[in-house]
């Protein structure tokens, strides 16, 4: 059938994607610390360079960030997204939720409140809280308001800057593996699809 022929072509095309591999640090592909990585097949390029009148920088972090992180509150994690991650339970090898959750979203939890400064040099509760007239966090006023970590700068200076140069991955090797797994599953070969999914989970958490 045409559907079968199409799926066979899909498998063939994905088998021809070579020379790529999964990146261990998932978040590095979305914060400018690992542009055009070995997992990236195609990504939208940005740059802070203004040579010869060029303007390839963006304000993506302002659109992504919550107001607590000096953003515009335009693109926020939904309750559905957070629930989808958490309903699996704390099953990661770290003893926490899926590691990709912590690399994708800032939210109120022990991980972001352990004194390691994972939220721009401080704890989550010192960003998402009320402040006194001297701009000091008021103890006991913290709240949970998830904010995307993906497509946000890695450090305070980057957060403070009104512009950023974070590339946007449009196709990654992980996407290729997932598409191949989907086709294999639809063909009735879940035993071949599962190892592809596990390969991603083993690397990305």
PLM ranges: what are they?
Residues 54, 59, 97, 142, ...:
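Short alpha-helical segments used as structural interaction elements across diverse proteins
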Residues 131-172:
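Active-site beta-strand/loop architecture of penicillin-binding DD-peptidases
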Residues 201-205:
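Conserved catalytic neighborhood of penicillin-recognizing serine enzymes
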Residues 7-8, 12-133:
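An aromatic- and glycine-enriched ligand-binding surface/loop that stacks and positions planar moieties
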Residues 23, 61, 82, 154-162, ...:
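Generic alpha-helix detector with strongest preference for long hydrophobic helices that associate
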């Amino acid at each position: 059938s045409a559907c079968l022929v199409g799926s066979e072509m899909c498998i063939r095309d994905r088998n021809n994607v070579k020379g790529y591999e999964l990146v261990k640090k998932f978040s590095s592909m979305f914060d400018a610390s690992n542009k055009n990585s070995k997992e990236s097949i195609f990504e939208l390029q940005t740059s802070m360079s203004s040579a010869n009148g060029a303007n390839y920088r963006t304000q993506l972090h302002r659109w992504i960030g919550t107001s607590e992180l000096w953003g515009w509150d335009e693109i926020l994690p939904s309750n559905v997204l957070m629930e989808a991650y958490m309903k699996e339970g704390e099953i990661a090898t770290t003893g926490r939720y899926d590691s990709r959750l912590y690399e994708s979203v800032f939210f109120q939890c022990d991980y972001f409140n352990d004194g390691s400064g994972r939220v721009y040099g401080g704890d989550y509760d010192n960003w998402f809280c009320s402040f006194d007239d001297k701009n000091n966090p008021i103890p006991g006023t913290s709240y949970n308001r998830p904010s995307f970590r993906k497509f946000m700068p890695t450090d305070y200076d980057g957060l403070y800057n009104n512009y950023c140069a974070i590339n946007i991955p449009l196709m990654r090797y992980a996407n290729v593996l997932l598409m191949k797994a989907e086709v294999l599953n639809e063909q009735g070969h879940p035993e071949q699809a599962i190892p592809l999914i596990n390969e991603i989970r083993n690397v990305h958490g």
